[in-house]
Amino acid sequence: MRVLIAAGGTAGHINPALAIAGALKKADPTAEIHFAGRKEGMEYRLVTQAGYPFHHIEITGFQRKLSLHNIKRNIVTLWNLALSGPKAKAIMKEVQPDLVIGCGGYVSGPVVRCAAKMGIHTALHEQNAFPGVTNKLLAPDVDIVFAAVPAAVEKLGAPQKTIVVGNPVRPEVFTQAKNRDAIRAQLGAGDRTVILSFGGSLGARRVNEVVGDLCAWEQHEHKSVLHLHATGQYGVQLFKDLEQQKGFAEGDSLVVKEYINNMPELLAAADLVISRAGALTLAELEAVGR
């Protein structure tokens, strides 16, 4: 069996796609799993790190706010959209998949639509209660739709072929939960309280601001903590500015990264998790009992 998965934009689309890929490989070790996405997107790094073949297709969303910059970006988007159909068809010819799965993000659009037109079996997975635009447009044309929660079924517009299955969680989230003590030892946590905070792969300004206040308090009050924080892509400079403004710094008690690549390990080690209520985040927190 050969499967092509299209997902992109944020970790909330990419990580469930990787979880699906892992489940397919477990069910059929001979299965070939391929991914389609943007090389400039987060999906390229996460998918190639996981060891799956990656096929590039350039597609972006439209900017809704009116400005000269956004007009230029929308012209580029129109150009990429025009090229995305032929590119998706070329990927189909190269991979020759038996099944194409869309897990959200703009990149799913041309890939899944092309597969459906070519008579290839197609499926969607929707992680959220409020489906994204791409999945809502694709749902009527695919063979089957998987929804994480019942609230999404009617909103997807294809209730007769939608099944509620929950959100897939990466196997390593469960396996690493058993290694809590060893992971804490590797982190040098000792008896300290381990706090893990993040606001999503792109970052959340308000989360970064609140965590900045917390980090300042922890250091000024000399609290016995090990705080691990991910700023997200758009929060890197903001958090550096907060360090200067509020008088705290990275060091033995605070580790700051743009993105956490070893989230299953850190979830296992954490005593407290501070995060946005993203669908996949909630699923993984529930899996480890945090």
Predicted regions: what they are:
Residues 46, 65, 178-181, 185, ...:
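Donor-nucleotide binding loops and adjacent catalytic segments primarily
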Residues 13-25:
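Short amphipathic alpha-helix
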Residues 28, 90-96, 187-190, 269:
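Glycine-rich phosphate-binding loop signature in dinucleotide/nucleotide-binding domains
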Residues 34, 42, 53, 116-178:
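Active-site-proximal region of nucleotide-activated glycan assembly enzymes
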Residues 102-103, 263-290:
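A donor-sugar binding/catalytic signature common to diverse glycosyltransferases
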Residues 3-10, 30-83, 165, 233-234:
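Conserved nucleotide-sugar phosphate-binding/catalytic loop shared by glycosyltransferases and other
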Residues 43, 81, 88, 134-135, ...:
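Acidic, amphipathic alpha-helical patches
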Residues 87-100, 107-123, 136, 140-141:
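Glycosyltransferases and closely related glycan-assembly transferases
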